[in-house]
């Protein structure tokens, strides 16, 4: 009977751990592998997963494997190669001397001609980098001619069932990025209401 209870308990625990691990893998790239009760907010937690775990080929199983003082996993470029498949794929050195990954155009100085850095995905919310001479580093930009518009892009707008990212082709409203109110002769107007906006031919 004791053996039966032992085996039953072991099986239940194994099932719980297995289910927990399955729930924790938020996506195939595993940018974070612990989900909350609603399955929405993710975090990397070394208590739940072994940051040092390796695959049979010797590579690390998780994109972030270094644990901080709070036992939370951090993404370290010294541990794994950074690339656009990882949620953070630009590396720079922190004050602690370690090299960390970041998804930021600010850390892609050598790649300002490479639009693949900052690709627009859930892993990388900024998908296009442009070198800003005044700031002397790359900044993120949104150009819908580069990628299809969708509701994750800041320049996405839908007007009359038509999707557009161009102020010249859709009716402006206060939800539009180029909508700008100004006052003229005591009257509040918009500079993006067809009357003041450049037309398609301009």
Swiss-Prot record:
| A single cellular component GO annotation | extracellular region
From which domain of life does this come? Answer: Eukaryota
Q: List the disulfide bonds.
A: 51-64, 120-126, 149-167, 172-178
Point out the signal peptide segment. Answer: 1-19
| Subcellular location as annotated | Secreted
Glycosylation (residues) = 41
Q: Which UniProt keywords apply?
A: Disulfide bond, Glycoprotein, Secreted, Signal
One of its GO biological process terms is: multicellular organism adhesion
Biological role: Component of the insoluble proteinaceous cement which allows underwater adhesion to rocks and other surfaces. Shows specific adsorption on calcite substrates.
Q: What is this protein called?
A: Cement protein 20
